[in-house]
């Protein structure tokens, strides 16, 4: 079970929490589509800022968005000019007042989503997939990861037949619910087609009371 399922979804309510924090009965579908639009818009607009996670909270006529990014300076801009523009554009999507919080990801090497995007970027630049995987694994372990597994699927190295290759170092216990495992997925758009990149980073066990 732990091998197949999304590791974050598997741990929701145990050691992980939801990225969308709101409750709606009649408007559930509308809010869900709105969340998707917000996330797609922010990912596209702020791609160079290294977006790790976007949390959305809703209350009455207000929407609070927490953005976790590796380079928050690119989002804020000079004297906060970029944030104000962002607020206006998001208010147009949601038709509500929008508040934005920006949190810095201090160690991007330990963030699975950012590692996956980094590997995908290297593959797009025609760097050999084994080299890209090994480089990311080494830097994550250097910054304190207990274990990491990177999987690449697709026409690797321009091969006729698609295949899956993975590289792992350390422990990645997928069945242990108390294991703090971060998961990230990215796609590399190469001339041969799309290569999927999955990253699992084990950061240690969360013990009761922590």
Curated annotation (Swiss-Prot):
Organism: Trichlorobacter lovleyi (strain ATCC BAA-1151 / DSM 17278 / SZ) (Geobacter lovleyi)
Signal sequence range: none
GO BP annotation list: translation
CC terms in the record's Gene Ontology section: cytosolic small ribosomal subunit
A GO term, aspect molecular function: rRNA binding
Residues that span the membrane, as ranges: none
Protein name in UniProt: Small ribosomal subunit protein uS3
Keyword Membrane part of the UniProt annotation: no
Protein keywords: Ribonucleoprotein, Ribosomal protein, RNA-binding, rRNA-binding
Domain (KH type-2) ranges: 38-106
């Amino acid at each position: 079970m732990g091998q197949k399922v999304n590791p974050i979804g598997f741990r929701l309510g145990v050691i992980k929490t939801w990225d969308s924090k709101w409750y709606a009965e009649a408007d559930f579908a509308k809010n869900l589509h709105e969340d998707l639009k917000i996330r797609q818009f922010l990912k596209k607009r702020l791609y160079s800022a290294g977006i790790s996670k976007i949390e959305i909270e809703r209350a009455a006529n207000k929407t609070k968005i927490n953005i976790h990014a590796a380079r928050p300076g690119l989002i804020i801009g000079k004297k906060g000019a970029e944030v104000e523009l962002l607020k206006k554009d998001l208010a147009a999507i949601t038709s509500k007042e929008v508040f934005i919080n920006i949190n810095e990801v201090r160690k991007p090497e330990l963030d699975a989503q950012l590692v996956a995007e980094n590997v995908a970027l290297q593959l797009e630049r025609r760097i050999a997939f084994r080299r890209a995987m090994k480089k990311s694994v080494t830097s994550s372990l250097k910054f304190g990861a207990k274990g990491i597994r990177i999987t690449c699927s697709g026409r690797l190295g321009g091969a006729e037949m698609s295949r899956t290759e993975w590289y792992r170092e350390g422990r990645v216990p997928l069945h242990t619910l108390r294991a703090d495992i971060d998961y990230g997925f990215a796609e590399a758009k190469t001339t041969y087609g799309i290569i999927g990149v999955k990253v699992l980073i084990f950061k240690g066990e969360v013990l009761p009371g922590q």
